[in-house]
Amino acid sequence: MKKVKFLKLHRADDNSVLIANSKEIIYINTDPESEDKKTTIATYSDDEERAVNETPDKIYVHLESYGFVRCHRKSDNSVELFNIDYFIVCSTDEDGDTIVYLSNSIEMCVNETPERIYNAIIQAQTLYNREDVENTVVKKKTQQNANKDQKQ
């Protein structure tokens, strides 16, 4: 079962609490169209993007070990995050721009090279899997200790 992080965020329009499920988030970025640069969250199950007050950097702190990659938008160098579960392909186009393709026909033009994106994905996978392995080891040791206690 995929590990899930629930984020407590605040809606941009009225500051009310919004709870987001990390496994449903495709990407997070700052809306370049908005004057106040609100953060936008796009989810897999819902076509509607949500605007929140928290910055992508602040959100990334909570999602770093949950399979998210941090990169920078080419047009304004703002931070963008994407979930590696929704990653499809990354390549350089004819103009030399790096394009990241995600599920739901989402394209991101970023400053990082495809090699850098690849390394970031591997690092995100490693962090994600390491925590799963550590949790499994702890569960096994706890179960072994419980079994020993029952035998005694």
Question: Which positions does each model-derived feature cover?
Answer:
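Eukaryotic intrinsically disordered, low-complexity regulatory linkers and tails enriched in Ser/Thr/Pro
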Residues: 1-152
